Regions:
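N-terminal signal peptide c-region/cleavage motif recognized by signal peptidases
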Residues: 16-17
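Bacterial N-terminal signal peptides that target proteins for export
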Residues: 1-8
């Protein structure tokens, strides 16, 4: 086999192997507390090593405008990622969260802010 063919096969194998290690979140749940101005983010993100496989970046958007970028350096739980983000949103606003894994892969979720309950 020529050197070029060996090199191409090696690169393709390396790319295929690295794609197998990506571990994006498998689900994201969002809830917004309008009284507190707090967005609660909870994602299922299994991790084999909390310091190597974790949610490394969260981008938050309100009505398509990026309002927050948060960086993380480890995950605190082997199965879930959680965080609370302070932001202002009104009923009808669309909040989008995009989570990125340290090993590659991403997942996004949107929610529409509802009217606050009156307690009746």
């Amino acid at each position: 086999m020529s050197t070029l063919k060996v090199l191409i096969i090696g690169v393709l194998l390396a790319l295929g192997a690295s794609a197998g290690f990506t571990s994006p979140p498998t689900s994201i749940n969002l809830s917004y507390d309008q009284a507190k101005g707090s967005l609660h983010v909870e994602a299922v993100h299994p991790s084999f090593n909390l310091e190597k496989s974790y949610v490394r970046l969260m981008n938050v958007y309100v009505n398509g405008q990026q309002v927050s970028t948060l960086n993380y350096f480890k995950q605190n739980d082997y199965n879930t990622f959680t965080d609370d983000v302070m932001l202002t949103a009104q009923p009808g606003d669309v909040i989008k969260v995009d989570l990125f894994c340290s090993l590659g892969g991403e997942m996004a979720q949107e929610m529409t802010v509802g009217k606050p309950s009156t307690g009746e």
